[in-house]
Amino acid sequence: MVGFGANRRAGRLPSLVLAVLLVVIAVLAFNYWSISSRHVLLQEEVAELQGQVQRTEVARGRLEKRNSDLLLLVDSHKKQIDQKEADYGRLSSRLQAREGLGKRCEDDKVKLQNNISYQMADIHHLKEQLAELRQEFLRQEDQLQDYRKNNTYLVKRLEYESFQCGQQIKELRAQHEENIKKLADQFLQEQKQEAHKFESKGGNELDTDNHAVPKNIPEVAENGAGKNEEPSSHHIPHGKEQIKRGGDAGMPGIEENDLAKAEDVPVALKKPPVSFSQYESHQVISHLPTGQPLSPNMVPDSHINHNGNSRTSKQNPSNPLQRLIPGPNLENEPRIQAEVLKQATKDRAGDFHKLKQNDEERELQMDPADYGKQRFNDAL
């Protein structure tokens, strides 16, 4: 390339060669495309010819097979013709025998016609029997229908009576529940009346006690109650020691002789004024089914375990001056009575629930159908 293009301009010869090469490539590509398309067409024609050859071979095989089948059919037809000729000979002999049988049948027919009169009489008799049997069948069918109707009526009656029994059981249960509720309300009202009675009695006794005590004692009692708001067994002797040591216990209006007089008050006055009502309420609660007895001297914040034994029960102070004043005890009494009534209602509700549950279990154990059957048998 360098030697040929040394005496010419650079750049013209390579472009011409490139154009020639492109033309040659295009011609070769066109020739290749035309040859390949022709080759494809020829291959398709060869495939079609091969398919035609296969179809002709298959048709030839079918024709040969059909020819052999036709030859076999010709042979079989020939055999059948021979067999039919033999059958014809036998049928002719049978026909002759049948003609003889026909003659004998005609003779038998005459005999049977003679017996028809007797058979007609028998048929008439059998028809009469059939009519009687049909009537008997209809009568029995009517009886069966009546029995079925009676059975359905009895079943419905049994179901109705069982339903009525169930309704009566429900009504009796409702009445029983209402009676239990009425008894519970009556019991609570009686408890309230007794509590009010004992309250009034306690108030009357308190009035008499207040009139019997001198005027200077309540002032000392108020001072002692302020010191003994948390009732404990340790506060009682401590309060007494303070009163004895100080003489007037910090109050100038009270002297030692007044304290001596207060200590000489009878033992009945030293008891709390609501001890009767508390004692009666304690007795009422102890007789309840599930209630636990409350101590009359028990303070509301005393801890009680589930077995009813008080762990750390704080008793009311035994200070005689404080017991003579009805203020704190009368304030605590309505709360104690309210707690007593609450506990009684809870116990009553628990007993009512248990009774209701026992009634339901008893009714579930008793089948209403058996009860209805028993009632039905008694009615029959």
UniProtKB/Swiss-Prot annotation:
Region span, Disordered: 192-254, 280-380
Coiled-coil intervals: 35-195
Residue intervals on the Lumenal side: 36-380
Location in the cell: Membrane
Regions of compositional bias (Basic and acidic residues) in chain numbering: 192-212, 227-247, 344-380
Chain ranges passing through the membrane: 15-35
Keywords assigned: Acetylation, Coiled coil, Membrane, Phosphoprotein, Signal-anchor, Transmembrane, Transmembrane helix
Keyword presence, Transmembrane: yes
Positions carrying Phosphoserine: S233, S275
N-acetylmethionine carried by residues: M1
Membrane topology, from the record: Single-pass type II membrane protein
Main location: membrane
The family this protein is said to belong to: Belongs to the GOLM family.
Designated name of the protein: Protein GOLM2
Gene: GOLM2
